[in-house]
Amino acid sequence: MNEQYSAMRGNVSMLGKLLGDTIKDALGEEILDRVETIRRLSKSSRAGNEASRQALLNTLQNLSNDELLPVARAFSQFLNLANVAEQYHRISPHGEAASNPDALYHLFTRLKNKNLDEAQIRQAVDNLSIELVLTAHPTEIARRTLIHKLVEVNTCLSQLDHDDLADYERHQIMRRLRQLVAQSWHTDEIRKNRPTPIDEAKWGYAVVENSLWEGVPAFLREFNEQLEKSLGYQLPVEAVPVRFTAWMGGDRDGNPNVTAEVTRRALLLSRWKAAELFLRDVQVLVSELSMTVCTPELRALAGEHTQEPYREVLKRLRQQLNNTLTYLDARLRGERLPRPADLLVSNDQLWQPLHTCYRSLKACGMGIIANGQLLDTLRRVHCFGVPLVRIDIRQESTRHTEALAELTRYLGLGDYETWSEEDKQTFLLRELNSKRPLVPRHWTPSPETKEVFDTCQVIAEAPAGAIAAYVISMARTPSDVLAVHLLLKEAGCPYNLPVVPLFETLDDLNNAEAVMTQLLSIDWYRGFIQGKQMVMIGYSDSAKDAGVMAASWAQYRAQEALVRVCDNAGIALTLFHGRGGSIGRGGAPAHDALLSQPPGSLKSGLRVTEQGEMIRFKLGLPEIAVSSLTLYTSAILEANLLPPPAPKQEWRDVMDELSQTSCALYRRYIRKNPDFVPYFRSATPELELGKLPLGSRPAKRRPSGGVESLRAIPWIFAWTQNRLMLPAWLGAGTALEEAMTEGHRGTLENMYRSWPFFTTRIDMLEMVFAKSDLWLAEYYDQRLVDPALWPLGTELRQQVQRDIQAVLTIADTDHLMADLPWAAESIALRNVYTDPLNVLQAELLYRSRHQEQPDANVEQALMVTIAGVAAGMRNTG
């Protein structure tokens, strides 16, 4: 174990020393000594030395206002560097990658040992569909400019990881590392302004350009090699099991800053970036494909008189890409150029000339050339294509209801909003079947309603394939889905866009089966969807509504029911998982999360959100992206070919009890305890989080209101900061404890050993408890909370201790994370640096709340501690 982590610890130590040298150069020996003293005290405190803990508290409480910011920045920046070292460890030949066998090779070996029919495996590979939806949730706290520097630090670590480096080469790399660490130190880590939705969209496109553009073809090459080695089967050229969609620029749910015009601009920007990236690819191909021998098919395309037919075809495509770039550039500047005759609007325009070159090279005995850069480009065409990433539109159901109500009132038909569900459906289906338009040409709607109609107009004008789906948040009835279909029809949408209901509260999840059964019984609807249905399961809001245990069971049961309903109706169901990065929002290691899904729920593929900082941790580097995509692929193939058994009725009964008990306790605190909201507001930096310019979306659905109006992300962000992690465990451990008291211990232990769903739930609770810290949570209370509310904090911390014991009993282990030593090592490594930031944050919150005049140093240092704790916890919300 120690050997495996020695390389990572060595990198962490080296980066820490470089940061120390930078601080000394910038601020002098005295500040560096202060930082080192705090680090040593923190390390000793973590080892259980009570005197060191008290000294740590005294030292941080007595920092002058001028010392606050440098100390906060030192520990925050160290955690960023430690995260880079840990991320590199995942892909290093001397790290985790070396000790873990290839996930796909391991899976194919197991499948063979299970005597699975090769045709069955091949069919599962052919049907493989992974769609990752990049979202702009405001959990990526690091600035893009710092992320670029950290990516280059990773590159330097990779370069140093070679035994054959000459001394001067090693010296040059170390010099570059010093420069990067110094650049980071002298860069403000906190944004001054909130990013706009277009800034967020550009960040998403940068992930594609800097990582996925290389990462996806590299993953497909590795996947193909494993298929050849294990099955003697090659991945077809046109098979691309991975696709990417974005919510940046399309998700307007609760975000008034995402307008129809913003979506139109995001669509243009993504097409512009795609054209630019494909132009680079084609330029390389023009220089590489100088061959003269070709098929008659390519000769006919290139013309009879050219000596270099491949180059001739590719030069035309290059010109087409240049023309497309010029046109899109003008559109983005607000100019109206005539549309070029050869404007690229469909993937087929890219695919055909490239694939003709590919077929010619293969037919003429040049397969080795065809399967190089050209194959990578062809796979990019299928994965990214002309849109680069497709965009989802998301809007709340009530916005559509209000828009239609305004229209029906204008037309003298009554108030749609007040109609019964039956009357709404009758009206919607009549209009969907009508050949005449419903919206009068000269009607002037309110700005809110105009925005809904304008969005549908943007969808109608977008090239087919640029928009992936229209997601309806807070969908509760069949009319919520039919209403969007009518709005799109009225906009003249020329293609059948998937309209996706999102079920996200406990009641909505429990009602999902009834809603979809009713929808699929409607003849018009069945005819329109042509045998395919997508449904989104919301993890964040259901967990905030009912607690993680009740929410996870409701999500599982809803998925089972939806699979059953669609199977009975002969409909192919794709479940869209709206998971967050944190446990309280459905986050879990991808492999475990997928294997814990109900049997049959992944047979039409996987669609899942990748949120905020998790995009950087899982997809931010080409090698990391390859690793993440490999894990997704192996997990989906395993879930479909070796599905877990359906849970026994006895297990279901126990889960029903756990769900009811945990939900009741969770809601008793959150909704019924009058002390809870004041305690939450004072014990966490919830109010101060609103000052952080994290994302373009407001933190609350309504400016006034309590916990219920808070979005799931800031709700979890706040509890993560004070280390109580409450949303990720409240209610769950108590329910387990009560179930054991009632004689279910043996059943729970059996469930943990034999049911992946339950195993993942318990493992995730272990992870949360390992990241939580009760002495720090208590310190926040003592420093910030009215003593009259202290009993509530004490009660919650005692609850955590009992919950930990319940989890350890069921897992039959003496300490947390016994089966996940890598994660335990990672948490332990960062705690030494996160603890001082937590103590400092509590001190800064105290000063900030008690000062008569705002102090810029205090405010800035507080923001830095929030960013630093987020880095230390490896997730925000």
Curated annotation (Swiss-Prot):
Its EC number is 4.1.1.31. SUPFAM superfamilies: Phosphoenolpyruvate/pyruvate domain (SSF51621). Coiled coil: none annotated. Its cofactor is Mg(2+). GO terms for biological process: carbon fixation; oxaloacetate metabolic process; tricarboxylic acid cycle. Keywords: Carbon dioxide fixation, Lyase, Magnesium. The active site is at H137, K544. InterPro entries: PEP_COase, PEP_COase_bac/pln-type, PEP_COase_Lys_AS, PEPCASE_His_AS, Pyrv/PenolPyrv_kinase-like_dom. It comes from the Bacteria. It is an enzyme of class 4 (lyase). One of its GO terms (cellular component) is cytosol. GO terms for molecular function: magnesium ion binding; phosphoenolpyruvate carboxylase activity. It catalyses: oxaloacetate + phosphate = phosphoenolpyruvate + hydrogencarbonate. Belongs to the PEPCase type 1 family. Forms oxaloacetate, a four-carbon dicarboxylic acid source for the tricarboxylic acid cycle. NCBIfam families: PRK00009.1. This is Phosphoenolpyruvate carboxylase.
